[in-house]
Each structure stands twice: as C-alpha cells, then as structure tokens.
Amino acid sequence: MINDTDPESFLRQHVGRTLGCIHSRPEFKDIKGSAERAVMDKELKSFIYGYYYYMISDSGRLLPHMFTATNEREFPKNVDQAMEIKLSSKPWYKIDENGGHSKFNHAGRICGAKFRVGEPIYRCKECSFDDTCVLCVNCFNPKDHVGHHVYTSICTEFNNGICDCGDKEAWNHELNCKGAEDNGRLEDEFDDHDGKISKMLESVLIELFDHFIDVFNQNIEPLTTIQKPLIAKLRYFIQNGKYNEQADMLRRLAYRNQYMDEEESQQQTPSTSLDPLSTLKDYAILVYNDEFHNYSQASAAIRQGGPDNKHIDLLTAKIDSEGRSLLRCSADIASLMGGFFSVQSNGLSCTITQWYEYLHQEACKYSIMWINDCLNIPNSTFQSLFRNAIGKVLCSKYEPFYQSIDMTSVVRDYFSDSYLSDDPYLYADHSVLGEGVKIPLGRHKSLDPGDISAISPILNKVIAEDHHEYTNSRLQYVLFLENRYWKKLRKIVQDLIIPTLASSAVHKPMFTDQLVEIFPHMTRSVTFMDREPQLTSLRESVVQLFTCPTTAYSIFHSGHFNYVIWSVIDVFVDFSTMDEGTLVWQRVQRSNPSKSYSISFKQGLYAVETLLSKITDPNLLLKPGEFIMIVTLCKLFNGAWKIKRKEGEHVLREDQHFIPYLEYTTSVYSIIQTFDKVLQQSKDHIDQRLLIGAINLLDSFLGHRNLSYKLYKDFEIIKFQISKERVSFMNPVHTLFSFLVQHVPLQVSIQVLSQSKDYLVISDFALRSVVLCSQIDIGFWVRNGMSVLHQSAYYKNNPEMSSYSRDIQLNQLAFLIEKNDFQRVIYNMLDRWELLDWFDGSVPSTETVYDDKISSIIQQFVAFLYQILVERDFYKKFDTLEETQLYNIKNAIIYKLYAEPLSYTDLLNDIPDYLTESVSQFDTVLEEVSTYIEPKGLEDNGVFKLKKELYKRIDSLRLLNMGNDFEHSATIVKSHLADSKEKRAKIIVKPQLLELDELDPCARELGSFTRTNLFAKLIFKLLKLAVSDSSFSFTYELLHLIHAIFRDDEMVNGKDSLPEAYISKPICDLLLSIVDSESGSFSENVVATADYLLDNMIMKRPTAVLESLTECFGTKYIADYKIRKANQGVNFEETEQERKRRLAKNRQQQIMNRFSRQQKKFMDKHEEYSAGNDEDVDMDGEDLAGELNEFHCSLCHDDVSDDFFVIPIYQNYSPVFLSSNPTPMEIYKPWHGFDNNEHLATYNTDLFYKKKENGASQLMHESTQKVLVSCNHAVHYRCFKHYIDKKRYSTDLFICPLCQTYCNSVIPVDTVKLQSGDRLLQQKLTGGLDESLLLTFSEYSSECNDEVGKIILSLKDSNNGLRLNRNDPTWIQDRFLTLSLQFSNNICMLEMLSRLNKDPFGTLLSGEEQKFKTLQNILKSLAVYTRLTKHTEENVLKFYEDIRSSNLPSYPFFRVVETVLRSRLSFKDCLQEVLVERLKGLTKDFGSFYRKYESELRAQTCLDSSEFSIVLKTTILGAGFGDQVEKHTLDLFYTFLISELLPTLRRSIILLKALKQFMTGGDDLDFNEKDVLSGSLTSESKEKHFHLLIRFLLQTDFYDLLMNSHSPLSPESSLVNAPHEYCSIIKLTDLATHLNTYVTNNKNITLREENDQKIRNTVNRLDYKICLICGVKIHARTDGLEMQKHMERCSHGSSGLFLIPNISQVCLYLSRPDCTVNISAPYLNSHGESGRNAIERGDLTVLNHARYEHLTRLWISNGIPGYISRVMGDEFRVAMANNRTFTRNMFWRPGAAFNAGGESSDEDLMNDDEFGNDDRPDLRFRQPDVELRINGGPFGGDIPIRLPTERGDIHDFFEFVQNMRGGMQGDGADIPTTEDIIEQLQGNAMNGFFGRADRNREHFELNDQSDGNEDGEDEEHENNASEDQDTEYSSAEEGFDFNELNNVE
C-alpha cells in the first residue's frame, strides 16, 4: 500500500482523503433515526479504530506486537480489510489490559500515566518537591519510601492527575521505578533504527490533527458569541421571507472541504426548485450541555424540540454525561426550524448542523479516543515512539495540505457590528481564528518602561502589542478551539494533550511557551466565551506546567510573565471601579449563570500564585516592572470591600456580598505570603537596592492618599470616624508593605519611611482595621447582623493571612518613625478609637458613641496598646531561616497546648500550614516542649501535654492567645504553675518581653512613647475609670499593661528604674484603692497584680510613692498599710541582709510544718493499731428461702410483682459455630490468647467463606446456631406493650427503652429464687436427683393465672429473614425449645470468648458479668416455660432429632446441657456419657485425619503421651492402626483428643457456674471442698488444664475415661458421627501488621477476590473493602451495595465488619434494618491516633491488638447490632421506620455515619459522638427486600405500623412521614390500644393481671414523659397520630394469633 518513493506523502494523502471523504461512505452517508444512529456510532468507531491501527502498523507487520492477546489470523491483510466493519465479532484491536500491567515500563521518559478512577495516587512527603508530585500504582516502589510519610488518595472524576515518575524536578532524589524494576529491556519490532516508524506515526497524526482543526475551525455555531446573533438573524430572515439570505448564511456556516467541493462539481445539476432552502439537505438539531439548566428544565426543553427518540430521560442523561446529543434530523431543514427555535427559546444551547458536519465531528471524537487507546498499548518502545510523535506533531506549525476555510468573512458579514470593523481584537473577542486561519491578535500587554518609577492609583501606563507572531502550532489551535468541543470531547482532548506533553522533557518547554503565548486568549475565553467554563484545560495545564521551577524561570526570563499576569489583571479590571481615587475590584453584578467569572478569577489568581511559588531568585520579583505588575493585581483588592455601620432596626436579611471579596482577597493574601516566602528562603541573595526600591514604590503608593485632616490642639490628625464612614477590613498591599519592611534593618526602614509625606496616612488604614474588628467584636455593629462578626473573626484569627499582626507592626512603626511627635500619634490613635473626646474630658465615659459598651471597647483598646508594646518578634534577630521557623513553631505549639492536651491532628489543625511544612522540624520542637501521653483505653487517642516549666513563658495578652479570654487564660497558667489555691493566689502572670540583645538595636526605643506624660495620663484616666466601677472588665488587662510598661523601662533604663511620669501621676493611689477594695469588688488576679505593682513601685521609689499615698490616704492609713505588709513578710524599710534572714527563717518553719503533716498522716493511716473496734457484727447475712430477686422496671422504675417481667433480647444466627475438617494448624496450635499472624493476612481459609444455601437446610442451619444477646434491663410486660404501641415499634424490631440497644424479641423471667439451691446443685453434680432440674425449677417458679400463661406462651421467637412454611419444623416457633438450644449456644459463645484471653485457662470464669447474667435470665425464662409447657415426648424427640441432623458443630455440648436439665442423672454421668461417645467418634476421625496429613504430621510438635501410652495403643486400634504404633503417632493422637474434648469440658464448667448463680446467687464454685477458681483453672498449659477439668468434673482421670470408651457402642448413640467443631481460637481474619501495606504494597497482599465482572481495572484499584470475617476483598460498586451483596452470598449472619484500608476505617454493617456505622480501624500511628487522622499524613500505622481483640469480641458475642443502634441513636430510629413503614420505596442510607474527609477529625475508636455525621448525604430509593407489614392483626389482617414523632435532629423528618401517611390513609380513624383489643376478646379476664396500683401507672407515665431518651410530648403526638389511622390495630406481638389462646393447654 505504501508508496516507496515518498511513503510519508502518500500516507498523508491516503489518511487525509479517507478522513475528508468519510461522509461519502455508504454506512454513514444518509441521515438516520435514533436506533440507526446508535448502530452507526459503533460502526464509525470500528471503522476509525481499524483504519488508524492498520495505517500505523507498517502494512500490518506490527499488529501482532501491539495486540498480543489477538490471534494473528484475525488481523487484516490489507487496508480494505482494516476498513471493514464487523460488529458481530470481537474487534481484533482489543488491548489486553491485564497483560499490560506486567509489561508496564516507561524507560527513558516521564511516566505521565493518567490516573484512572479507583486507582491510588501516591505522595511522599520526604521525596516529593511539593504536594503536586505524585506516583501511580505501577511506578510506586515501596522500597524507595521505607520510613517515609507516604499518603494516598483515590482517583475520582474530580481528583485526578498524571504520574510524575521520571521527572527529575519532581523528586528530591532519584527513585527506582517499580515498572523498570520488574521489566528488563527487550528487543522488539518497534526498535526504530531508521526512523521509519516515527515518520509513519507522524504522518498519520499530522493528518488526524489537521482534519480535527479543519472541522472545528468551521464549527462556530456552538460559540456563545455566535449563538445569539445567529438566532436573531434566522428569525429575521424567516419573519421577513428572506429565504435566499437564510440559505446563503446556513450554506456558509456548513462544513466544507476540498473533497466535498470535488464531489459537488462532479454531481452538480441545475436546481429547478424555487425554494432556496431546498438546496439545504440533511440537517440535524444538536443540543449542548450547559451550566444554566437543571435536569428537569433540560428535559422539558428537549421535549418541546420534538426529538425522534421517545426516551427523553435517556437524551437528557446523555447530554448531561457526554455534553451533547442529536435531537432529531431531517432531509428538510424547514421541518427542523420549529423544534430548533423551541429548544432555543427555553434557553438551551443548540445548533442546526448539517449531517455531514455532525459525522465529521463524531469521527474527530473517535480519532482522539483512538490516540488515547494507543497510549495504553503495553509496549514501552512503542509508547516512546508514539508519544514523541504526538509531541512533535502538536508542537509543530499547522501547515495542512489543503487550507481550511477562513471564517472571518462570515463573522464580519453576519455577527459583528460595523463600528467594530476596525477593532484589532474582533476575532479574539468572538473566539474565532483570524484571517488566513491564524491565531488572532490577543491582548498582549507590557509596562511602559518610562512609567515604572511609581505605582499609579489607577493603572500604570501599558503598551499593547498591535502585532504578535504566534507559533500557530497545532497545539495552539486545539487549545484555542476548546470552547467549541462538547464535554466528552474536551475531556479526552485534555487527557491526550496534557499528560503526554507535560511528561516529555523535550516537548514540555514547547508546551509551556505555546500555552503562555495564547494565555490571554484562553483566559478571556473562559471568562466570557465558554459554555462550560469548569471544563477548561487551563487549570490542569497550570498545575502540570507552572509547578515546575524550570518552567517558571523560563516564563520570567523570556518576559512572558507579562502575558500571564496582565491577562489576569485585565479580567479583574473589567469589573473594577474607582473608589476614593483608587481603582478597586467590585462585586460582579452581571448575570452569570455559568459562573465563568468566578472560575476565571480563581484560576487566574492560582496561576500567578503558582508561578511565584516556584521562583527561588527574589530579585526576579523585586525588579520594578515585575514588582509593579504584582502590586497592580494586589491593589485591586486593597480596601475593596468596605462596610458601613447600620443604625436603627436590625437587618431583616443579612448581606452576603462579602463572600466573593473575602474569597479573592484571601487568594491575594496567599500571593503575598508566597512573595514573602521567596524573600525569606533567599534572604542572603536579595539585592538591597531592589528591595529598598520596592519599599519606596509602596511607600509612595500607599502615602499618596489625600486624606482629610483636623486640628486638635496644635496637632494635625487624620479626620475619620469608623462608626460613621465606610471602612475596610482587608488591605493586602499594606500587608505586603509590612513584609518588605521586615526584610531590611529597622534603621534602614526608619530612614526610608521618615522621608514619607506623612507615615500616619499608611498606618492609619491598618489602625482602622484593628478598630473595626474591635468594634464588631464588642457588638457595636450588631445592626449589621452576624456576617460582620464572622468577617472580623476570619480576619483576626486567620494566621495564614498574617493581616492583623501586620497591622500591629505598621502601627509600631508609627511610634518608631514619629518618635519626635508622639503626641500626634497618640491623639490620632485615640481619635481613631473614638475615645479622644472622653480623654480630653469633653464627654463622660457613659456618653461616648459606645454608650454601655465603653468597658468592652476599652478592654480591646488596652489589648491593642499592650500588643504595640510587647509584640517584638518582628524585630528579633535570627541567624538562619531554620532558626526563625523553629522559633515560630515553638511559640505556636506552646500557645496551643497550654489550655489542654491535644492530639497530634488537632494540634496540626490549629497551627498555620506554613509552620508544619517541615514535619521533622515540627516533630523535633513538639518533642522538646511537650510530653506524650499514650492512649490508655480502647477509644481515646494519644495526646501531647505542655511541659510544666514552659507555662512561665506564656503571656495571655499576646497575639498568639488572641482568641481566648485573658483572665481565664491567666488562671489556667497559674493552675499549672502551682498545686494549691494558696500558691496560685501569690503567682503573678508576668509580661513576656524579648530581651534587648535579641532585638534589632532600634527596637529598644519601641516603648518610649509609654514613658511620656501624655501616655501616663491616658493610663491614669483608664485606671481611674476602672477603680470608679469595679464591674468594668478591663482592669486586669490594664494592670498587665502597666506591668509591661514597668518591665520595658527596667530593660532600657536599669532594674531600679521607674518612669517618672507614673510617679507624678497618682497611679500608686489607684493601685492601693484596688488592693484595699471591698471583698469581691475585684477578682483575686486583679488584686494580686495591683498589690505586686504597688510593692514594686514602693521598692524602687519608696519616698516619692509613700508621700503620694500619704497625701491621698492619710498618715495613719499608710502606717497601718505598712504594718499589714510587714505581717505579710514585706518590709519596705528593711535592709537586704534583714530580708535574707527573714526568708531563711520562713523556709525553716515550712520544713517543720511539712514534717508535722506527714506525721499526722501516718498516725491516721495506722489508727487501727492504736484503737479497738467494739462494734457488733451482723452475722445474719443469708437470703431467706423463696425471696424475690431484685427486679426494677426500666420504664416505670417500680418492682411490683403483680405483673411479670420480660427482658429485651437480640437473637440471631451467629457464624462462629464452625464446622470443618480438622487441620494440623488447628489441632496442634497452642492457645496463647488473641493473636494476629501477618503471614496469614490473605484470607481466612474456607472457614467463613461459605456460600449461603437456600431452602430447608439453610433454615435449619441458621435456626440451630442462634445466640442470644441482652442488655438485661427488665421491664414490666404491660409497660413494654405500652412502650411498643406508643413508639409504633414492632416486637421483632425495637430498641431497649433504657440503653437504646437493638432488640428483636423478649423473654419472660421468673422473679423467685430457688430454695436449697446449694444442696440441689451438690446432689446434681455427683449423685443425681429424683426428678429433672427443669421440673425442679417449675416447682419453685412463681404462680400465674391461665391468661398470663397464654400471653407468655404467645411470645414468639425472632425469625428475621426466614420465610416459614408448613413443611418447616414446628419447634422453630416453640420458645421453650429454642431457648434451651440458645442457652447451650450462649455458653459455647462464652467459652470461645475466653480463648481470646492472654490466660485462656485461668480466666475462664472471670469477667463477662453481663453475659453470665444473660445465662441466668435464660434459665429464669426456662423456669417459667417449664411450668407452662407440656410438651409431648414425640415433639421433644423430633426436636432433638432435627438438632442432631442439622450438623450443629456444638451438638455434643448441647447433649450435655439437655441431659443435665432434663434427665435425673448426675452432672458427672451426663458429661461422661457424652465424652465416651465422642471418644469413639474422635478415634475414628483421627485415622482419616492422619492419613490425609501424614507427611505434614511427621514434623509436627505435640504433647508427650508416655503416661497414657498403653491405653492409647489400645484405643488407637479403632482408628485403623496396627499393634506397632510409633511413639510420635501416639503423641499426635493424644494431642488430637485433648484439643477436641477440651471445649466441651470448659463449657461444662461454665454451665456449672451458670447453674450455681441461678440456684444460689453465688459465684464461687467450691464443690466437695474443691475450689474451681484456684484449682482446675489455674494451669499453664492446655494439657494440664484438660486433666484438672477431667478430675474435677468426672472425679476420675483421663485413663479411666479412655478405658470406658472401649465398651461396645450403644445403638442409640448419635455422637460418634457428630460434625467436627473448630477447636482453635476463633477470631476475625488476620490482618497486615501495618495498614500501609494494603495501601502502598497492595500487589503483594494476596486476597481472595470477589469482584463484579462489570468493575474494570480491579488489579490497580484501591477503593475496596476487606470482609473481616472471611478476608475477602470486595470492590466498590457504583450503587454502593457491595457489602449487602457480599452478605447475601456469604453465610455471615445479619451483621458484618469491613475494613476500608484507604481511609483506615471499619464499616459495621447491619442488614435489618439496613444501616452502617463507620468506626476507626484498629490501627494506630506513632502519635496514638486512629482512623483517617492516622493515615492522612502518611504515618506508619500499626495494628493495635487490644482494639482488634475488642472488635473480635464484639463480633463473637453478636454485639454489633446493639452497638450500631446505640451509636446511631435517632438515625437508627429512622432506619427502623424505613424498614417497617414504606411498602414500595424506602430511604436508603448506604453510609449512615461515614466520616471520609470531611474536615472533622476522627477523635476516638468507637466514639459515639462522631458517628452521627454522614459523608454521603444523597438519599436514594430502592425496592425493599421483604414485605414491610407485620402480621398478627386481630382478625388475621396486617398491622400497618406508623412512624412515631421523635425529638432531635430528625424531628422534621418524622413529621413529614406522619403527614405523608396521613394523607395516604385518611384522617379521623380511632385506633384501639392493645388493652382494648384484649378486653374485647377476653372480657375482663385480664383485669387482675394488669391491675397495678394507680400510683404505679401515674409514676410510669410521668417518668415516661420526662425520660431523656423518649418523647417529652408523646401524649400530644399520640393523640395527633391517632387521627391518621383507619385500620384495625392489634397487639404489637408479631405472629400473635388470639385464636390460639383458647387452644393453649
């Protein structure tokens, strides 16, 4: 096929012609209906793919190497075969995805792989340049990151990117790619030695992209700039009958190419029609997606357009997902115009497009998709060649064989106004290519070199380019035309271009240069001309390109930074206005439904910030041109958002206009922070001339304001009143100015700024922000609503912006610069705080503008003055940047930890991000200043506590503590510094001022203004005001300020110095007034501080101060004061020597006092030895026979006995009863308690992974393996019925009224103790009884009448999920029989739990009190049923026969329980009978076991059987062994028997304890003077434990037991063939030691897969769960039902646990009601944190065995449902309501408490407070699996259960459901109560039973109404609810058939 003379030219012509003539192929030529279009779509894709692949295969030679999974016979032999369309067969070009993973390699290039949904995105804190550098699953090599902080995220549609592996700039050191490690370099057919393959690829790609550009160059109709005028033109032509003009315009808009022209010239025939539109054939209506309409609006518009597809929803869904869809097509264009205008009139974007053009656009789409498919071919050589070819073709100039049609004439003729004809930006503003099909001229600007000496308040002069030479590359064309593509096409174009070019070292610089060239075009396109601006490629391009330092430098050095920043500035300037002489941005007030303005604003600011952040040379940014451009952008937001205080009425609707200002100004602050960071990191390389020049530029700009002044005394101060005028919070340029000043010596700053016109003009704006925040904080702006309060808090407390602290620094500079004019600065400051009139006495404090808030504003004012004086970190000298960072980190940690210990995550969240960038620095400082406290329980996290000695460094009035109350903070500090209250009262919290030698020399004068007479006067007036009214809240802060002033004076002028101004003003008099004030007038802190300051003043200047005090208070008063102080140890006149002597004497007295206290404590402790106790001891401690047990109703809290008690229970199938073939690991593994074997962390064999069977066998399986769980909260039956009725619960679905535990049934309990319990038990243990225990129970159980008995017998068992039929066993519904079986199962479960203990033998009977109490309650219930039930022997025998045939693994022990309770035999005989039969069966089983594992058993370690060798040799003959048996075989047999029999023996001991507790109430088991607790259970090994139990229980030894087993087998024996029960430790699946293993080394963890065939790429996906029961990996499904599906497949019961590795959580799942709770996984990091917090920073997380054991115990004991109900609280009630009420649809909550990300932290494992959040708020509906009506109505009908109205967060939801059901069922029905129905059917027979005293009923009702867990308004709700029901209402008992009452005997 290839022409050898010029193959490239021939190939290009062939591809060009094929693409250009694709419309003429028979398969695609004619228009088609909706069904035909669907087929054509597949045909077009098949044609495109097959043709392209063949054209790049060198005539098919390379196809077998590209598609290795395809048989060579299926490949086409020539191009014609390649172009054949065969939809019926599998395409031959299918890429083998699974095979590709093993062959992945990107040797010699950057990986650049696009992340696919579900795949992990890896980041390494230590290795990466920044957070944008990521690795894919194929490249990530765990060996490179051992000990590093590796953290992952999951790729989603909105969180994606490309792999940076191989990019040297992305990583701090070279990485070893996993793909390169696994694959060697192999020679293949793609080695391109002669360049032939490259040229072939380039030729195909050139024509592909040229055709693509040609098609979309002519496709201008979708442009937003064209659509409106186009519609207007069409309407004008049609309305005025100008059909020729209409046809001409449509013809010029249609797509044309040279091949079409050739075809028309050959087929042209003269038209005879008079209708000009008849020449326009085959048109279609295309509807495009936009961001203006919702789903329903789009559907309505489409319906009006008359689509040819009746499935409107499918069309709408396609438009939403793909971005466009074809509505209908027709050969007659006139028939389409009505539909076209109908869709347009509804606002949807649509075009009327020729069929050929639509076909070519679709071909272009598949062409791009084909390129993306090629990028997945698993051949590294091909990938290198293909990617290089793509880069070369895209970055080269667009020079097609045939020039595309120039559309500029169409734009000029139809879509532009005449006055715009000379506009140079006409085509750019219409987003069309310019003349000659070139990139049109854009807005490229640069600063005028002659205007860089100052920053204009408006805009500096710029030079706009009138001509620009663009590269005109294919890349620029494809990006420029982007806003014409629809959603799907845009996405695949971006997936092609950005990863491919950004990952190429050769083409990445070209990509950058060409993108920056058209950056102005793309920015304006996104802003004004994009239908879907959120899909722009600009954002992703910026992320991939501008984050590269080399790229950033090239942009600056090439001068192209102008293009970027001026395009951003231009967009903002378009929305700016003049305000007080400056140009500032204002909120957009134009209609913008696409939100393109917001997207463009954010994108532009992000681009600038990203570029600046990658610059390391600060001089690039300080150059006048670049600096002015950056400031020009920032100054648009300097004071942009101004607010004015409102007066009068409160606002009805708060102003939310501040949000965009806040959002964009915050981004500007980020740019400034980035700018400062660049200066900090390269401080030694800063050109000081450039820096000073930048300061001068800002000084002149900020000082240019012409402000109004007013004359106060002799000083000109600025005239401004914050409470009356418009004022702004944020001034980012002032913040930048503060940063710059800090980078030069303070002396230089003062010299430069002293030349300012008036520095107060600059500092005053910062002062306004401070005052504004203070006024808002005190509630002075309350009329403006809450929004201003949020703004103020955001401004002050956002350390990332540093704005508030910078305002403080600018005001500090005012005192340093204006040091010769302090009075003016102070007066200006007082005026700005609006306190000047009060200060000069013009108005009293009560008549200022603040009225009653004067105290609060002065408190803020004093804090401001203190910060001006004390905040000196700005001037602290540091040698290195690291020293600066460590200092700031240390201060931040100290001030966050002093109030309370914090977890690591909470601490990080409270500290600015820029201080936590270096993890090592942060951790080093944290270790230095804090003490780590490990988590002590199962639910808490590790916390860090501040070291005690550091509390002395805390200053509660500093900026670091600004968010906390000063006095409260001081109290906390004092409480940590002193242990007793007396000591705390003496402690004075001192101001913390940096020493002068740590500061810049000029900073020593910062406090000079505080020593002036004017300032001393201010302090005096403030203190006088505080003394005049002790209720003022600023006194403590004011005293702290005075303390700081004295401390600063000491530092400057010496230790004994005291400012003269503070002596001349009688401040000391006021201090004494505070000290001697009445008790309670001032707080202890205030009095102590005042006393300290007064002492300090007297000590320094005793004469002057005492004279002032005497003059004020009188001589006698001061004399008394001196005496009082002397008594306190303060003598103002004593010498230094006298003071030392006095202190020594005091210390001696303290020592003697301490000794006396210790002596008294010793005597008190040993008082018993010195005094006798003659009190009598009450020896009568025994219980009376027949005494009632103490039962109290949980609802009415009464203990009356005329109503029987029931216990709420939860009973359900448990999967822990494992039946399986024995294995050596199970039999011979010793018990050492709960453990975890990382090497087994694959899957838990086949123990738990069992497919659920249907039918009778599954019913029997689940019915016989139920366990019963209870909270053991008793309740009267009548109270219970009333509770169920009122709450509208069902008896098989309710929660305990006391503890909110999920229950599904109740059991009645007897309240009478047995008489002579000890004697009976002793007899049963050894000698037997005259009758069975059950009959003995019945004799002592309480009497009840027949009616009560019938009620008790009607209580049914819970059969959740079981559908009974007439063939099912009757005993399943017999509560007595099922309870006896569940009693046995509960004991088995309790024994399994004890195996998890560290000492499984000694702790068998210790702990688990609740579970033993449950066993007692079951026995009490059996006692009740024994009296009432008269089972026929036939039913009982059938019951036991069914149990025997059900393969119940614990059947042997059930036989023990059954014979002990029902037979007259002794306990010993019952047990021995079972053990003997089991020995026979086990002997037989050992034979098959040995033969199966013979080779493995030869090396097995086991117990020594020497003591029993003789009898074992005889016994083993039954296993098929001969007489000569090896010693090792006997040892194996001996160990086998012990392992198999031990569980039954242990359970028998538990049975004994349960009987002992039930019959006697005691816990100790001492039979025949043998103490079980200290005897049989105290053993170190399984063997010793076994023999001790044998001796105790059977009063014999193992030898005799073996001998007894030699007797002949009884024909009735059923235990010989009993199923084998798993006898090792039962637990959840083994897990990896480190959770990170699942995340970072996923491929090395072999897990059983349970993936859905519809889920793709399962090998690399990380969004999976692990079933902790069976260890199966379950991949996420789109419908969120993966857990439910797994539970349906596996026999796990109704609840499950699923580990979610990627978020470190465990999902607890409950199937009925369907709900989930997410808790932290049992993994902890080094900081003691769990859950998301443990892994979000990449910390190594280790499995915590205690927490995992706790989860295991929760699972074994069937406690997950109860735990879920308690955690969910009200949400569980909603889940129950959904499960019972909705008969067709139900709210489906797949993750009721899922916590992924949000931003709240995971505090504790199983923290009930944290599980109410829902990260998946969307509610979906689905069909319920079961009928949601309960049977048991009074006349055979169903009971419709209505929802109760509940309080709490879901109150409104309950009301909604109630109203909905009321509307469905009607109103006015009278609902009878359960009591009414019973009385109606049974007469008054029940009156005696329910006849409790009135006081009890009243007590119950009152208590029920006040119960915190119940409704306080139940009466009201119940009355209201009764009106919404019109059907019969019966007893709440499910399955309660009243007709059966008369049949009960």
UniProtKB/Swiss-Prot annotation:
Zinc finger motifs (UBR-type), residue ranges: 109-182
rRNA-binding in keyword set: no
Composition skew (Acidic residues), residue ranges: 1907-1927
EC number of the protein: 2.3.2.27
Residues in RING-type zinc fingers: 1193-1300
Metal-binding is among the record's keywords: yes
InterPro entries found in the cross-reference section: E3_ligase_UBR-like_C (IPR044046), UBR1-like (IPR039164), UBR1-like_winged-helix (IPR055194), Znf_UBR (IPR003126)
Keywords assigned: Metal-binding, Transferase, Ubl conjugation pathway, Zinc, Zinc-finger
Region: Disordered, residue numbers: 1901-1945
UniProt-listed PROSITE patterns: ZF_UBR (PS51157)
Pfam families: PRT6_C (PF18995), UBR1-like_wing (PF22960), zf-UBR (PF02207)
A single GO molecular function term of this UniProt record: zinc ion binding
CDD domains reported in the protein's UniProt record: RING-H2_UBR1-like (cd16482), UBR-box_UBR1_like (cd19672)
Biological process per Gene Ontology, one example term: protein ubiquitination
Pathway annotation from the record: Protein modification; protein ubiquitination
An example Gene Ontology CC term for this record: ubiquitin ligase complex
Annotated family: Belongs to the E3 ubiquitin-protein ligase UBR1-like family.
UniProt remark on domains: The RING-H2 zinc finger is an atypical RING finger with a His ligand in place of the fourth Cys of the classical motif.
Protein name (record): E3 ubiquitin-protein ligase UBR1
Organism: Kluyveromyces lactis (strain ATCC 8585 / CBS 2359 / DSM 70799 / NBRC 1267 / NRRL Y-1140 / WM37)
Protein's gene: UBR1
